[in-house]
């Protein structure tokens, strides 16, 4: 059946900011869906609050509303645009929940908007735990013994009846949020309370634990005529009990018998038919490893993280096909873009193995509880493709960028067998290395399988890898022959791993490979196991025979991607990479992308001329460059992952376009950079590197407190802190030198000024600054965690002139051709430079969208030799728009147990939203709403615990808050000072004192906002840490910067929260 002619204008709801459990996969699926709709001549209206996405670009939708994803604001868009249809399944859990809410509140009926694709009734049957369980019982699909729980007492009673352990699964939440495994009543009370609070309908499913069973997933498609196919099945190497987002996953499944495979496939199709899915659906099963017993865990009646993985693993574009089905097409009418011959009703066939490994953020949260369970904690993931499991798995390990190239990890060498067993039984992000060490020491495979729930098939593969590592370590380079080296390469060993074990350099192994003609061949991902010729140039490396790459003589450029999503290097860099590829293709240049992230738009095979799904290591990148012989490589847009390849590529005489490794060194080496600033007469905060506690204290006395301290070599502000006195500095330096005595600690005078940021473009002669951004929080809060305003609101014309002058001088002196990011501080009327990055930064998507300057496109054309003056955007500072746009960071700390919440010099946010308004107050209010921050709309009781350095400033703000009708609760010191200022304050006892104390008030949700300025962040022994954690875990607003509080006060004084706010189409 062809296109439904009644559908002319479709509203697509995006997924909002990147958070743990909902990452870049929805930018990929949303972009695909929008493009599929536009292909059919349908007008696309997009609502999404996330400015860092490709899907919010003017090329992707006809109208783009970067507005909060709430019923209030989406209704305004519907009222203004009058779409006839709504596509709900492309925006993750956020989009699904919002669609259900719009339906239930009668808004869709009010404006006559039809839901296309999977219906609201089907969504409810998939998402509501009780409806889903009843449906499974009706179609005789086994479910785990369970009960729908809406209050604590009935949960406790049911758990006593079925016995522990039990699993808590909240309804309508994301990534297992609020859920977990409870082994006893005490744990149940804690987990159940959290789950009931965080479920949007106050409902959880309490079920008997089948921890240790295999977890199997099927990705299924169904059209409105009842045609069904399974796109892909996937096997979690980790058993049930670890969230699938935190599990290592392999596709296709490796350990299922044909009977098990067909049994679960049939069950998937029965389920998707019963629920009435129209589009894509993910079905998760628990399978007893010792029998054919299975149970349905849950379904996702939408595109998901798993569907993005299945799309990339097979080449089957699930989101695109789902969008076409929503328009009325049948699977047998939708062409397969990979082959150009077959149709979407053909089930993909895989003749390779795919492995997904999660990327966790624990490097940013040293004190975090790393034990994995039913709550997802990974920020991103990598995918690796190989001709066998071992090859894909080792590619995956080196793709994680954790400095590991094999299964050996030094930290596990000295552990006793008992300690290793504990690390394996309570799995964390490093379990695979502990498990490998157990196998290395000869621990019986059947025993390892028993205690981990990991199938013997995988353990035998790991043991083989470990045994080969041991053989290498007992050998020399002279023992290595062609046959052995070829076997190792076929099983995924990198040159570096082999070299490390033989104690030679990787270049030596590369030389031997060259002599013995051991070069990788590249195979195509074609969806059909080679049965039909494929049109999509989408490749993975193998050391088997037959190469499927056709190398052209065209002018070509390699673009290095940014790898997995992590804190400090998020979706913004994928945005930049994709725009670079688009710009190159417009210029007629063949583009080759290398990346390994299955969630992103850059790894959609339709984006570039060729896609290599490979690790971003020196060897893997060099192999592709050797094969393709490009005219240049672009590193500027792939974040630190790409930039760190600059020196290696220079050594190999491979040309990089834009910034060179020498320019990177000049910007990042402190001494060289200080010399440059001195020559240019540009100020920076005074400071130096110190090697001891005594030297550090002496330097601090010379500079005067407060002092910013940090390790020498850090990314994303890792390990940075502001110290206010000698006691704090001594504490920091003592710990820092204990961790690393081989490198200096950098000590800078901390200037408590206004932070200013620019992304600029230089062609070596002229400089264009698309916009000057102002950070709301003063210097000392990492730029990625600060609220950012454009146009700048509080900067004088003189400072703006200095910003442009310094930017020009730095860009031209460093020799930038392309992009440069500079961060400044304005302190007491003077401008200081604090950081220069000779590459794209995380603010590029934001400033591109709100200034209207296509920054990446221009920077790419400059790298190809064009000049700014010829590109139509002028030079100097670009004209400011009428609307004000505020970028607000979004944090996922609620999902990570025992991690710090407070703002500081180390970045912690995972995503961002945009607020757009006629003035800064309207924009701030929208930003606060979009980021789910406290706005004062629902309650006005503030708990204030303020450090001594901040009390004077807080007292001024509290007077305004008092006038605005806020109530204060505070501990003795702050309460007394509030009363002295004429403000009524209720006194509360400290933690540890008799009830009711601070923690009781938080647990009982008698507080609406916690304002807590930390004395020492990252110190889990302090009361402040526990107050912040307790509040965030109960969805109570927390502000740790008085600048954020001041913004709240200002927008309330201006009445932005009471005003009828417009929504803006940014195209």
UniProtKB/Swiss-Prot annotation:
Residues binding Mg(2+) 3, per UniProt: 823, 835
Span list, region Carboxyphosphate synthetic domain: 1-401
Cofactor entry: Mg(2+); Mn(2+)
Enzyme Commission code(s) on record: 6.3.4.16, 6.3.5.5
Residue ranges, annotated region (Allosteric domain): 933-1067
InterPro entries: ATP-grasp (IPR011761), ATP_grasp_subdomain_1 (IPR013815), CarbamoylP_synth_lsu (IPR006275), CarbamoylP_synth_lsu_oligo (IPR005480), CarbamoylP_synth_lsu_oligo_sf (IPR036897), CbamoylP_synth_lsu-like_ATP-bd (IPR005479), CbamoylP_synth_lsu_CPSase_dom (IPR005483), MGS-like_dom (IPR011607)
Segments forming domain MGS-like: 933-1067
Gene Ontology MF terms in the entry: ATP binding; carbamoyl-phosphate synthase (ammonia) activity; carbamoyl-phosphate synthase (glutamine-hydrolyzing) activity; metal ion binding
Quaternary assembly: Composed of two chains; the small (or glutamine) chain promotes the hydrolysis of glutamine to ammonia, which is used by the large (or ammonia) chain to synthesize carbamoyl phosphate. Tetramer of heterodimers (alpha,beta)4.
Keyword set, alphabetical order: Amino-acid biosynthesis, Arginine biosynthesis, ATP-binding, Ligase, Magnesium, Manganese, Metal-binding, Nucleotide-binding, Pyrimidine biosynthesis, Repeat
Residues annotated for Mn(2+) 1 binding in this entry: 284, 298
Keyword Repeat: yes
Binding site for Mg(2+) 1: 284, 298
Listed CDD domains: MGS_CPS_II
Residues noted as binding Mg(2+) 2 in the record, renumbered to the chain: 298, 300
GO biological process terms held by the UniProt record: 'de novo' UMP biosynthetic process; glutamine metabolic process; L-arginine biosynthetic process
Region (Oligomerization domain) location: 402-549
Example of a GO cellular component annotation carried by this entry: cytoplasm
Region (Carbamoyl phosphate synthetic domain): 550-932
Domain notes: The large subunit is composed of 2 ATP-grasp domains that are involved in binding the 2 ATP molecules needed for carbamoyl phosphate synthesis. The N-terminal ATP-grasp domain (referred to as the carboxyphosphate synthetic component) catalyzes the ATP-dependent phosphorylation of hydrogencarbonate to carboxyphosphate and the subsequent nucleophilic attack by ammonia to form a carbamate intermediate.
Domain ATP-grasp: 133-327, 674-864
Protein name: Carbamoyl phosphate synthase large chain
Taxonomic lineage from the root: Bacteria, Bacillati, Bacillota, Clostridia, Eubacteriales
Cofactor, how bound (note): Binds 4 Mg(2+) or Mn(2+) ions per subunit.
Residues where Mn(2+) 2 binds: 298, 300
Pathway note: Amino-acid biosynthesis; L-arginine biosynthesis; carbamoyl phosphate from bicarbonate: step 1/1; Pyrimidine metabolism; UMP biosynthesis via de novo pathway; (S)-dihydroorotate from bicarbonate: step 1/3
